[in-house]
Amino acid sequence: MQRSRTAADDAALLLAGLGLRESEPTAGSPGRVRRGPRAVDEAAPASGRRGKGGCGGPEAAPDVPSRPERGPRASLAGSDGGSARSSGISLGYDQRHGPGPGPPSGGSARSSVSSLGSRGSAGACADLLPPGVGPAPARSPEPAQFPFPLPSLPLPPGREGGPSAAERRLEALTRELERALEARTARDYFGICIKCGLGIYGARQACQAMGSLYHTDCFICDSCGRRLRGKAFYNVGEKVYCQEDFLYSGFQQTADKCSVCGHLIMEMILQALGKSYHPGCFRCSVCNECLDGVPFTVDVDNNIYCVRDYHTVFAPKCASCARPILPAQGCETTIRVVSMDRDYHVECYHCEDCGLQLSGEEGRRCYPLEGHLLCRRCHLRRLGQGPLPSPAVHVTEL
């Protein structure tokens, strides 16, 4: 590298010498410069000897100091980092005394030195080349080379063919958990909150009151905001209140009165038949059994009865045993036999003499006599050998 740079510097000096010879003024010439620089202030080859090319070249100048000059006279050839010597052609003189007839420079002397010096002496002599010969094309800077080889990092196993087996397993488990969560959410759906209109998910978020569903956070006291789930509350004017606010905030003035005892209902209220009751006051008028949560019925006078006492009081009486005809156990339909405008139990409808069970079948028909239920044979025996009457018509109601 040092030899090639020295040869390039010598060639540059030779071309500079030729330029100086052409630029010498003649007798009739005012001393104008044809090409290249007008004069050379300094030219110091690296070795301090004559340049190649023989006659016409500049003589060797004394050794320049190791510290190169700065400013417009700086050398065009870059200095070598391993040598204390410097060489090159100074362009500062022509640029200080005006441009020559040659091609104009693209920038200042300092910028030209820095740009050409990095490319060597051949680039510095672009203005000294013969006509028709252009400078070498500029090269882009090569990427920096690392002095040591970079280590190659191995790829994780399975990356060339997509995700690894562990990643696929993790993705499958994630999808399975999402499906399980969606299924659980669907199972825990209770309905729509009547207050906010949103869905209710989870047993802890559901609250049922007054025949409607609420969110636990939606069913609260309108006065203090306390949650009323599992607590006593009072409904006043389509608003609900906790027990404390209802009792100590003047709401007792609007409290309902029990239809039985006439007292204010300050605790739980039971509403039936358009009236309000204490739970303990809603009882059967016959047996006095509490009917809270128990089926009941009423008569024409709105008297309350349990089902058993209602049938006992209002059910038809059997003409044979004088007991009421009630529905069978577990059945709501009353079955009775009507004969001679009288009601009978099915088991009480039999012959009074022989006990034969009477019905509408042949041989079991009823032949009444003087208000008595008799079969055909017993009827003839009571009449002797007299003519037989026609069998009595009986009706069985189901």
UniProtKB/Swiss-Prot annotation:
Residues 74-90, 106-124 have a biased composition (Low complexity). GO terms for biological process: cell projection organization; cytoskeleton organization; miRNA-mediated gene silencing by inhibition of translation; miRNA-mediated post-transcriptional gene silencing; negative regulation of hippo signaling; regulation of cell morphogenesis; response to hypoxia. Its main location: other. Expressed in kidney, lung, eye and ovary. In kidney, restricted to podocytes. One of its GO terms (molecular function) is metal ion binding. Residues 16-166 are annotated as: Disordered. InterPro entries: Ajuba-like, Ajuba-like_LIM1, Ajuba-like_LIM2, Ajuba-like_LIM3, Znf_LIM. Adapter or scaffold protein which participates in the assembly of numerous protein complexes and is involved in several cellular processes such as cell fate determination, cytoskeletal organization, repression of gene transcription, cell-cell adhesion, cell differentiation, proliferation and migration. Positively regulates microRNA (miRNA)-mediated gene silencing. Negatively regulates Hippo signaling pathway and antagonizes phosphorylation of YAP1. Acts as a transcriptional corepressor for SNAI1 and SNAI2/SLUG-dependent repression of E-cadherin transcription. This is Wilms tumor protein 1-interacting protein. It comes from Mus musculus.
